[in-house]
Amino acid sequence: MAQILLHGTLHVTIYEVDNLQKEGGGHFFSKIKEHVEETIGFGKGTPAIYATVDLEKARVGRTRKIKNEPNNPRWYESFHIYCAHMASNVIFTVKDDNPIGATLIGRAYVPVEELLEGEEIDKWVEILDREMNPIAEGSKIHVKLQFFDVSRDPNWERGIRSSKYPGVPYTFFAQRTGCRVSLYQDAHVPDNFIPKIPLSGGKYYEPHRCWEDIFDAIINAKHLIYITGWSVYTEITLVRDSRRQKPGGDITLGELLKKKASEGVKVLMLVWDDRTSVGLLKKDGLMATHDQETEQFFQGTEVNCVLCPRNPDDGGSIVQSLQIGTMFTHHQKIVVVDSELPSGESEKRRILSFVGGIDLCDGRYDTPFHSLFRTLDTAHHDDFHQPNFPDGAITKGGPREPWHDIHSRLEGPIAWDVLFNFEQRWRKQGGKDVLVNFRELDDIIIPPSPVMHLDDSETWNVQLFRSIDEGAAFGFPETPEDAAKAGLVSGXDNIIDRSIQDAYIHAIRRAKNFIYIENQYFLGSSYDWQSDDIKVEDIGALHVIPKELALKIVSKIEAGERFTVYVVVPMWPEGIPESASVQAILDWQRRTMEMMYKHIVQALNAKGIEEDPRNYLTFFCIGNREVKKSGAYEPSETPEPDSDYIRAQEARRFMIYVHSKMMIVDDEYIIVGSANINQRSMDGARDSEIAMGAYQPHHLATREPARGQIHGFRMALWYEHLGMLDETFLHPESEECVSKVNRMADKYWDLYSSESLERDLPGHLLRYPIGVASEGDVTELPGAEHFPDTKARVLGTKSDYLPPILTT
C-alpha cells in the first residue's frame, strides 16, 4: 500500500482489547512463547499488557500497562499526536511487558486513507500476528481516530494574528499576559557594542547584560534564591567588565550565596548529580560539572545544595531505568529570586525569574567579541575553558573556547510558573521541606500580577514549557485522563510534560516568512532518514522538528512564496572532535540535514525551479581568528607537537561554541530555554528542560513586519555574527537577504580556513562546511573533509558501539 503524508494532528483513543484467550479457557500467553521480542527474561510474572501507536516504524504513543486483566485489558487512554510522517497505516501494537523487553501479542492496522477526510473513526480492529493472520479467538482492539490536516488549522502559516492568541494548547502552563521579558545575548555585552537598531515607535534596541542582572538579582534578594543547573561552579565571578564595576562585584558566586544565606535568605540549589563523572564519555574530554566540589563547598553552611540525579519514574523496565539514571541529565538552568517592585515605592516584593541556556559555571562568561587569545590575562585568566583538547590549559595558552549563548529574564505572572517548576522539582528530589512558605509572606510578596498594562506597547505574553516527567517533578496527576486534562502525555506508566517540542511545532506551523534558529545540536526526525546503512527504527530520534521545518519550506515552494530557515550550530559538539561520540552526533546531524535538503530539492524540481537549496535552508557555524598583537599573554608551556591544539594555536583560530537554544519566527515570536534540538531534550522522559515562548502583542507581523524587541534582538545577534548591519537583513525571507548572508558566510569561511591571515576575521558567521548535491545529498566541501586543524570528519562517522540513545 502506498505511503501518504500525514501532516497535522491525530487524535487517538485506545479503549480495550477483547478475548485474549484461546478456546477451552487455556491461557493465550502460552501460545506466544516462541514470539519473544527483544527478551532475555527473568521468568514471567503476571501479564502486563500495553498498546502502542505507530506510524509505520515511528512510535508516537504508548499506553500504561494493565496487570490484572490479561483477557480483556482496558485502557481508555487518549493521545494528541503531532504528525509529519509518511505512512500507509496507523499501527496498534499489543505487547506483554517483561523486566527486559516485551513479548509481541499482535498488531492491528488502520489504513491512513480512511483518515484523510477528517471524519471520526470508531471501530474494533482485528489483531494480526507477524504473518498477518488473525490471532487466536479473533481478538480485536477498540480504537477511535480522527485526523486534522495541518492546512485546516486556523493558525497554519498565519502567524500570531492578534493579542487574543491563546498560546500553545494542551500544555501544563497557560500563557500569561502583562509580563516583561529581557533577552540576553552572551553572558555580557560591553558598552557601545550594539549600533543603533531602530524599532517601531521611534525607539532603539537596548541590550541587556545577563550576569550583571543575575548578580544584582541575587544581591538584592531578601527572602529566596532558588537555582537549578546542569552545572553550578562556586569559583566564578559574575561581574568582570572593568568599565562596569559594581560594589562587591569581585566576590565569587559561592561566597555570594553563602553571604545571602547568612543574612537569612532561603538559598536552595538543585544541581545535577553527574553519575557519569566516571562514565562512558569521560575519555572524550567532556567538561566536568564540578558537582561534587559544589556540594562540598556548601556543606555545613546555610545554603541548601542538593545533588540531584536524573532518576527515572517507577514505571520503566530495568533497561530503561539504567538508561535514564546513567545517560540523562537535569538540564534546566533557572534562577528565581524575590525582588523589589518596579516602582520601588513600597516595601512589598515580587518574584523574578531567569530562564535560558547559560549555566552559572566556568567557561560561560563571554562577550560578543568572543576573543580567543586577548582576554587570557584578564577576564579569562582564571576561567580558561578548552575541553576540545585533552590537555587544554591556560599555561599552554589559547585558543580558549569562546561561548555564545542566549538567556532571558521573566517578570510578571510568568515568573511564578518558573517558581512552581522549582517547587515541583524540590518536592520530588530536594529532600528536606525547606521551601519558602508564601502564606507566611502574604503581606510582603505580592501574588502573581501583571507588571505591564495590556495596552502598553512594550507588554509581553509569555508561556512556560518543559521536558520533564514524574520522576523529576512532584504532583503530576496519576491517571492518564487527569494527565491529559493537565496538558501532559502518558507513557509507559509515566506521566510526561513534552510541551517544549509542542511549542516548536506550533511556532513552525504558524510561521509565514522566515525562521532563525541557534542551537547546540540539530538532529531528529530519524524515521525519515535514509536507511541505506542503518535500521532507522533503532535510532529513536523521533521528534518531528526537522521534518516540520522541511515541510514548511516545501509548502511555501509549492505556493510560490519565499520562506527561509537559517540555522546556526557549533562547528562540532563540545569534546574531542575525533572522538566516537562527537563523530556519531555529527553523523546524525548530516543525516538530518540531508533528509531536509532532499525534500526541498524534490519540491524545487517539481516546480521546475533551478535554485540553490541553500536559499531556502542554510546552515552556519561561528568561529574567530585573531592576529597576534604585541604585549599579548605569553604561555609558559607549549602544546604537544602535531596536536589539534598546537595547530589551532599557530593558525590562531577556533570555533565559537554555540550553546544557544533559541528560535525566532517572523521577528514576532521567540523561544528561549535549555532544550537542544535533539531527542534527549525534546523527549520529555530523557533530559529535564525548561523554555519560554513569548511575543509582544503590539508588535506582530500582521500587516507589516514586526519591529519590536524580538526584531531588535535578532538584528543585534546578526550584528554580533556578521560584524555589520544591512538593509536587506530587515527581510530575512527575501532572496536578497539570504544570498547576502550566504555570500558573507562563504567569504568568512574562506578567510577562516585559509593558510594565512593578514588581519582579524571581520565577522564570525561561517558557512557550515558542507555542500548540497543535485539530489539533496550532503557532501564535503572540496578540500574540507576535516575541520581545520583537526583530523575530525565534518560529516561524522557512524559509531558501531555507542548506543544511539546516548548520542541522539
From Swiss-Prot:
Residue ranges annotated for the C2 domain, each copy included: 1-125
> What gene name is given for the protein in this entry?
PLD1
Kindly state which reaction or reactions the protein catalyses: a 1,2-diacyl-sn-glycero-3-phosphocholine + H2O = a 1,2-diacyl-sn-glycero-3-phosphate + choline + H(+)
Q: Which cofactor does it need?
A: Ca(2+)
UniProt lists the family membership as follows: Belongs to the phospholipase D family. C2-PLD subfamily.
Question: Catalytic center at which residues?
Answer: H331, K333, D338, H659, K661, D666
Residue positions annotated to bind a 1,2-diacyl-sn-glycero-3-phosphate are H331, Q520, H659
- Do you know which InterPro entries this protein is assigned to? C2_dom, C2_domain_sf, PLipase_D/transphosphatidylase, PLipase_D_C, PLipase_D_fam, PLipase_D_pln
Q: Which residues form the PLD phosphodiesterase domain?
A: 326-364, 654-681
GO function terms (MF aspect): calcium ion binding; phospholipase D activity
Q: Which residues bind Ca(2+)?
A: D186, H370, H404, E720
Per UniProt, the keywords (alphabetical) are: Calcium, Hydrolase, Lipid degradation, Lipid metabolism, Metal-binding, Repeat
* Role description: Hydrolyzes glycerol-phospholipids at the terminal phosphodiesteric bond. Plays an important role in various cellular processes.
Please report the name of this protein according to its UniProt entry: Phospholipase D alpha 1
- Write the Enzyme Commission number(s) for this entry: 3.1.4.4
According to its UniProt entry, the protein's GO biological process terms are: phosphatidylcholine metabolic process; phospholipid catabolic process
SUPFAM superfamilies to which the protein is assigned, alphabetical: C2 domain (Calcium/lipid-binding domain, CaLB) (SSF49562), Phospholipase D/nuclease (SSF56024)
Domain-level remarks: C2 domain is a calcium-binding fold, and the binding promotes the protein association with membranes. A lower affinity toward calcium can be anticipated for PLD alpha due to the absence of two potential calcium ligands.
Q: Which GO terms describe its cellular component?
A: plasma membrane
Per its UniProt entry, what is the enzyme's top EC class, as one word? hydrolase
Family annotation (Gene3D superfamilies)? C2 domain, Endonuclease Chain A
